[in-house]
């Protein structure tokens, strides 16, 4: 299978039938041996954040994705065999039905893997699935071949064959609309007639005598109960459609045994249920349209208000067709409905009565809404609030921590060494990826280490002694902005510094206890600003500029290649899982952790604690299982 063709421009796989507890870290550990992975995403419900039981994995190389598809399909994760197929981003290809085969009358023992193994001999399979419910297989499935020719070969060979001693039907997949059109054409040519309401005094012989007058009857059957008595309905099958149609036209509504019988086309149970459902929905929609804009919902009613009092209060605003106070056990539930004859009258009643005090309680009056409408409105409001909360900037982390002593030296030193400040200039919550393209406010600075060029020291008498005079934080916001601008941003390009600005910019030293900031006279000028780099043995230095310049799909891979060896030294057996968990963190924070071993070690220990707690929970469940049996 050519994964690099026009059908599959990306090396992306769809992973289906996942256990709800499967996470990205588990999938990373499972699929990373196949090759470098750019991204993994488990799709979740937008409201509940529960897994939808499928995921997407993007490999760097199509060959790695194809290897995973060939070798890992139907492997078991958390007790469930997974189903892997190419991610088809074109919905037209998925919905066209070209190469899609339908199989029915399958034995219950046939699962996805058995069906795949049976039909893979006819060509490349894009998707294979046996439809199941909570009780197991439903006896049918689908196989989607890459080409129409492969599907034809499978149909010609397998249709009517025995699979596990059951004769299966194999044919081209047809959409519901196509099936309904075909079935509708067959229905118009019916030969089987259904008769009901003829009572208990009827048998096959007498029913044949009555209906044989309209044509040749192939079979006649009166349905009986366990005692041998008629259940009041039966079937008559004619040789052709014209005879059956004549029997329906002549006998429907006639009297037999003193009863008016019903005669019509025989229907399958699912067809009858669909027709009844369609009629019910039609009646429901007519009722909704009839009361649209004229039915009012009234709540906060006093317990003493009944139907007559409710009608009396709203009568001045128009003709009322119905007024009802909802009760339970003879007691008012505090709300009711008033229906007017026209929308104009209902609108006037809402305007006049909403908020009016009736029997010491203010009424709430509004147009009545169906439960589905209210649920949709509430869901929409909730999602809007959720989106607003996500779009709002988060609170600053560590905003109550006083920074350590920052100062820029005035001593001449060579520009070939880099010094890193012990704390970031502006510790903030790392921005999520979905907000990475939004403009930042002017006062925002990414969490980047403050650095300066380090030169050979010599004594300088112009550095004054700092006093711990007060615990009040000095007002140095303007200078903090300048100092922060000297550092390089982790998500931006290499910082550009204007030499003239560097010469005129005053240098300060800070202390948590001083009220005023003392300027330091610099005898030399900073010639350049060095960018922090993460050095790993055998790999090129990783800087913020280098990371930002890489394509988004490669940034996680670059960080993972540098994080994994460090984690492997601390926890060799859990390195894969922990790496996958940490790669979900924002890139800027990952880069900061690589620069700060203490931060990385802390995050690793947190991940280990989470994994150990999860493992302990699973062990407890396993140990408790035998006692439940």
UniProtKB/Swiss-Prot annotation:
UniProt GO MF annotations: eukaryotic initiation factor 4G binding; mRNA 3'-UTR binding; poly(A) binding; poly(U) RNA binding
GO cellular component: cytoplasm; cytoplasmic stress granule; cytosol; nucleus; ribonucleoprotein complex
Keyword Transcription appears in the UniProt entry: no
GO terms of biological process kind: chordate embryonic development; mRNA processing; mRNA stabilization; negative regulation of nuclear-transcribed mRNA poly(A) tail shortening; translation
Predominant cellular place of this UniProt entry's protein: cytoplasm
Record SUPFAM superfamilies: PABC (PABP) domain (SSF63570), RNA-binding domain, RBD (SSF54928)
Location(s), subcellular: Cytoplasm
Function: Binds and protects the poly(A) tail of mRNA with or without an AU-rich element (ARE) and prevents mRNA deadenylation. Stimulates the translation of mRNAs to which it is bound during early development.
PANTHER family, sorted: RNA BINDING PROTEIN
Protein's recorded name: Embryonic polyadenylate-binding protein A
Organism from which the protein derives: Xenopus laevis (African clawed frog)
Gene responsible for this protein: epabp-a
